[in-house]
Structures are given as C-alpha cells and as structure tokens.
C-alpha cells in the first residue's frame, strides 16, 4: 500500500522552558498507509489527542517532520490542512454552528474549498444532494433542512458533523472520541454511520477512542499508546484475533510496569 502520512523523529513539549515542562513525544515515529482505518486507544495523557492536533495543524512540533503524501506539512497552517483533512471532535457543538439551519451549515461546508470561501445560492440540485447525504444517517434529518442545528440532539448533531466533515474530497479523517459524549444507543448509531461512510468513500481514518469494543470491532489497525509511545500496533489477523480482555490485560501490565 502507499504511504499517506509519515511522522519522523517528532518531539513535542508543553510548558517548554518552565519548571513544569513536560515532553509528550520524544523522537516519535508513526506512519499511516492509504486506506487504513486506525483505532487509537490509550490511557489519559498518552498523547492520543495531541497526535491528532499535530496532524491537523492546531499544534506545531518542537522538532521533527510531518510528511503528507511525501510533502512536509510540519509548519503548514491549520486552515490550509483543512482542505484535505477532516475532523470530528468529542463535543457535538464543535462540528456545526448552532444558530444556523442544517441547510446553512451544509452549504457553508460545501463552499470550504471554493475561491475566497464564496457560498453560492443553493440550487434545488444541491438541496437534493444534501438530502441524499443526510438520509445515510437514518435519523430523518433530510426532512429537516430548515431546522436550527442547536435544537438537535447530541447524536443527531454528531451525525451531521460526520456528514459535513466528508462533504468535500478529504484525504484523511480524524475522529477525536467522537462518540464519547453520546448515550449508548446514539453512540452505536454514529459508529455504524462512521464505518459506512469510511467504507463507501475509502477514506483513510484515525479514530481516537476510549471504547475498547469499538476499537476491536471497527477498523483495520489498532494502536495502543502510552506516555507518548506506541506500545501495541496490531493489524490483519493479529487485530482480528484480539478481544477486549486482551487489551485490558495490556493496560494492566503497563500500569504495573509504571508503578501505577
């Protein structure tokens, strides 16, 4: 397979130059191939969300390189990376504008890569296209285009955020615990929608999750992080033969090794 993302010798510190300086990553290496769906698990503070922040451009590394399709994007602005990297956050409120309608949010997202961010008048053809996209959610959102997004439930809003993140032709999708704030039923619904969109559009995806069942059941690769390191990296038959109990055993072993 072709390499999409390569992180080389990356070091990242918080509180640099202060008594509270903390290195999250030190000489960290990581690669992602095109078409992979990588589930990332790990304890709090292991570097999972920091990794997504570095890839999206909301955080710049102290040293090292981030290569995207062999282009060095280490210092590229976040808004420029947003043209080819989509992201869905844990908080459903971050993926859409509450005061705008579903239609207005989708039209805004649709104009993301247009010159000067111009938003053209929405034609009947585009409205039909939006309805087709929303019908995948199986929540009836396609019939509520005039509804203010702020009135939607968390699950509905997160499903909308997923659709919006995939409206333009992105090369990489980042999911940052995107089901964590939802009730169990909504969480399962959004996860099934996630898998459907990724499979149909063949989008390379990194999904940070605390849900070990989702990490085991979904994706083509499973990475476990601890203290800025990848301590497990499973794919193929190795991932297929892994279960939740096996992952919990690894977590327990790590805790014992670290004296926790």
Residue ranges and their predicted role:
Residues 2-4, 13-27, 77:
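A short, flexible loop at the N-terminus of ABC-type nucleotide-binding domains that lies
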Residues 41-43:
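The feature captures the beta-strand-to-loop junction immediately N-terminal to the Walker
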Residues 56:
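Helix-to-loop junction immediately C-terminal to a conserved catalytic motif
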Residues 64-72, 232-234:
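Conserved ABC transporter NBD signature motif
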Residues 72-86, 91-94, 116-119, 123, ...:
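ABC ATPase NBD coupling module
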Residues 209-210:
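H-loop/switch region of ABC-family ATPase nucleotide-binding domains
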Residues 229-253:
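Conserved beta-strand-loop-alpha-helix hinge in the C-terminal portion
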């Amino acid at each position: 397979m072709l390499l999409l993302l390569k992180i080389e010798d990356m070091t990242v510190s918080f509180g640099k130059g202060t008594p509270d300086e903390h290195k999250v990553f030190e000489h960290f290496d990581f690669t992602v191939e095109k078409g992979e769906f990588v589930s990332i698990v790990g304890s709090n503070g292991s570097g999972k969300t920091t990794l997504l922040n570095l890839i999206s451009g909301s955080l710049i590394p102290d040293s090292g390189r981030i290569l995207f399709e062999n282009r060095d994007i280490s210092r590229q602005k976040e808004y420029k990376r947003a043209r080819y990297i989509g992201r869905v956050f844990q908080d459903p409120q971050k993926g859409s504008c509450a005061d705008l309608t579903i239609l207005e949010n989708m039209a805004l997202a649709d104009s993301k890569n247009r010159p000067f961010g111009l938003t053209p008048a929405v034609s009947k053809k585009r409205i039909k296209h939006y309805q087709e996209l929303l019908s995948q959610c199986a929540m009836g959102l396609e019939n509520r285009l005039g509804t203010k997004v702020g009135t939607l439930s968390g699950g509905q809003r997160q499903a909308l955020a997923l659709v919006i993140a995939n409206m333009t032709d992105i090369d990489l999708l980042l999911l940052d615990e995107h089901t964590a704030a939802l009730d169990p039923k909504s969480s399962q619904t959004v996860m099934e929608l996630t898998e459907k969109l990724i499979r149909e559009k063949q989008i390379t995806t990194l999904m940070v999750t605390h849900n070990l069942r989702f990490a085991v059941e979904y994706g083509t690769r499973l990475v476990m992080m601890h203290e800025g390191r990848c301590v497990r990296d499973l794919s193929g038959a190795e991932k297929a033969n892994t279960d939740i109990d096996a992952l919990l055993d690894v977590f327990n072993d790590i805790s014992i090794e670290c004296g926790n």
